[in-house]
Regions:
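Long, distal/terminal scaffolding or interaction modules
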Residues: 1-280
């Protein structure tokens, strides 16, 4: 493998069509498409500040690198990538990719990041700011995620999440086949219009959670006092630990809690209107 060390590249496409190359302490300055149409690329201790630095790259390993705010839309259409111990300050990262893994990565502008990814693995990843991360993704595994970005995991499917802390409203909308373990989910309107959403050993806060959900499963979860009007028009099986403030018009299934503040069943309930609501 060829090695390029302590070099600076700028302008347009300075490293176009390179293959089997390691870049060490390389700086990609202002310009566009620094590393494009490449394969088998290793980046160590590199600094990226130009736009679109890694497009159409097949097979890459990126470690201890920094992506400046100017490196927007940095990594699109690049498959089989591993990134570790990196900091990202640019928006719109990671689009239309297959087999992407991140470990110990902080993304400080997560705006429109992770769109259209098939095969995503995250370990100890932090997301800040921005809107709609993880849009239209599939086959995701997460162990360790902290996120205050808005509207995460919408229109995505086949997801397993462990040890996450997610702070936003409107998370997990229109998802399909998602299981979340041992996590804290904070924000109103959680999981609306979801299909096959399963929450295990989670703590949930925010108003009107888990409405319009189909085949919702809740196992050994707790709810903050602010969680009112839960489960409206949802079909579900729920095992709730502790108290839940209020439940409104669930469509079908079974809900068990230690205590329930209020059950609202009115003329607007949808059929079959046969949900069992029980206290221990």
């Amino acid at each position: 493998m060829e090695k390029i060390t302590d070099k600076v590249f700028g302008g347009e496409r300075p490293l176009f069509e390179i293959h089997n190359v390691e870049l060490d302490h390389v700086r990609i300055t202002f310009g566009e498409s620094g590393i494009k149409e490449c394969s088998n690329i290793v980046c160590r201790n590199c600094y990226f500040e130009g736009k679109y630095p890694l497009w159409h790259v097949k097979g890459s390993d990126i470690r201890n690198c920094y992506f400046a705010p100017g490196s927007r839309s940095a990594i699109w259409y690049s498959d089989d990538m591993h990134m570790e111990d990196c900091v990202i300050n640019g928006p719109k990262f990671f689009r239309e990719m297959k087999n992407l893994s991140l470990k110990n990565v902080t993304i400080n502008d997560a705006d429109e990041t992770f769109w259209g990814i098939d095969g995503l693995k995250l370990e100890n990843v932090v997301l800040h700011e921005g809107t709609y991360p993880f849009m239209h993704c599939r086959n995701i595994k997460v162990d360790g995620l902290q996120s205050d970005a808005k509207y995460v995991f919408q229109y995505s499917r086949d997801i397993e999440i462990r040890n996450a802390k997610i702070d936003t409203k409107d998370s997990f909308w229109e998802v399909d086949n998602v299981t979340v373990y041992d996590s804290e989910l904070n924000g109103e309107f959680l999981g609306w219009h979801s299909r096959g959403l399963r929450l295990v050993n989670c703590h949930i806060s925010g108003e009107q959670p888990l409405c319009y959900a189909k085949d919702l499963v809740i196992e050994n979860c707790t709810f903050d006092p602010e969680c009112d009007r839960a489960f409206e028009y949802s079909t579900l099986q729920a095992d709730i630990r502790g108290h839940i403030k209020s439940i409104k018009n669930p469509t079908s299934g079974r809900i068990v809690a230690d205590s329930i503040g209020e059950v609202i069943i009115d003329e607007n309930i949808k059929q079959p209107a046969d949900c069992q609501i029980l206290t221990r």
